[in-house]
Every structure is written in structure tokens, then in C-alpha cells.
Design a protein with these regions (language model features):
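Catalytic cores of histone-lysine modification enzymes
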Residues: 1-86
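C-terminal SET catalytic tail plus cysteine-rich post-SET Zn-binding segment of SAM-dependent SET-domain
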Residues: 79-163
Length: 163
């Protein structure tokens, strides 16, 4: 089961599918969502319908959390290269800054992904847009500084040991 703050609402995000948007002001540091569901290895993830694969979140080298429902409000967080939210641990999202009503709640998938299960052309439109989101973006040195303390634990350990 995923959770979305009552200060946000999941709805259509145009070409991006579904997203979560603030319906009340959200303060920096507030918990805005958490991911849940069942943990599956990549081999099982690959057998699920495409939408469910795209809504999974990688939590370890070969483990992905998948929602029990095809779409839950708490799993509608899109990627941005300049995100409004960041990961705390493997499954909790917190506001990185104050978020105004109407703003989309986003996080950078580089902070949790190390595989190609959800690679795509980025359309975030920010000044720091990487153009393509890949499972290897976590290796970019600039992101180590930008997202210090916001990487999923398995990636934080890799960064500490490899870089």
C-alpha cells in the first residue's frame, strides 16, 4: 500500500500519465508520500504489465516494490531533474523545499534506480535536465553532491564504496 499526503492529489499529468499535485501548501521537510507493496526480483517485475513496471521503485540491487493495485495515489510521483521532493531511506518522500498549491510533487529517479527497467527521454524542461533518464544516472558525480543524503540506502552504500 502506498501513501500520499492529504495535502496532495493524484491526477492526470498530461503526456507524463499521472502525477501528484499539491492542493495545500507543503513545507520543506514534510513527508509527502511513501511507497509500499510487495517486493519482487527483476525477473518477476519483467512479467508484470508495463504500467505496473513503470510504477515500481527499485529498493535494492535486484528488488523492486510493486503496488498491489495497478495505480494507487501514493505511487504517482514523476521524475524531474530539479525535483520538489527527495527520498529518505528507500521508501519515504519528503519535500526538499516549500511546495506551492498546484505544483507537481516530483523526485529524481537517479536516487533509487540502478537498472534499465524504466529508462526514458526526460521531459521535465528544467535548466539542469539530463535529456534521458537512465539506470546509471546515480553514478554522475554532480548528483552525489546535489542529492547527498537522499539516495536509497543500497545506492548510498555503493557511492560511499565506489566513488
Amino acid at each position: 500500500m502506498n501513501w500520499l499526503t492529504p495535502k496532495a492529489q493524484a491526477r492526470s499529468a498530461g503526456d507524463k500519465g499521472w502525477g501528484s499535485f499539491a492542493i495545500e501548501p507543503i513545507s520543506k521537510g514534510e513527508t509527502v508520500g511513501s511507497f509500499g507493496g510487495w517486493s519482487v526480483p527483476r525477473e518477476v517485475l519483467a512479467t508484470l504489465e508495463l504500467e505496473r513496471q513503470h510504477r515500481a521503485i527499485q529498493v535494492d540491487d535486484d528488488q523492486y516494490l510493486v503496488s498491489k493495485e495497478a495505480r494507487e495515489p501514493g505511487d504517482c510521483f514523476n521524475h524531474s531533474c530539479e525535483p520538489s521532493c527527495g527520498l529518505m531511506g528507500a521508501t519515504v518522500l519528503k519535500a526538499r523545499r516549500d511546495i506551492a498549491v498546484g505544483e507537481e510533487l516530483t523526485f529524481d529517479y537517479a536516487t533509487c534506480d540502478d537498472s534499465d527497467y524504466d529508462e526514458f527521454k526526460c521531459g521535465c524542461g528544467t535548466n539542469s535536465c539530463r535529456g534521458t533518464v537512465t539506470g546509471k544516472d546515480w553514478q554522475l558525480a554532480a548528483l552525489h553532491t546535489k542529492y547527498a543524503g537522499e539516495f536509497s540506502p543500497y545506492l548510498a552504500l555503493r557511492i560511499a564504496n565506489e566513488f
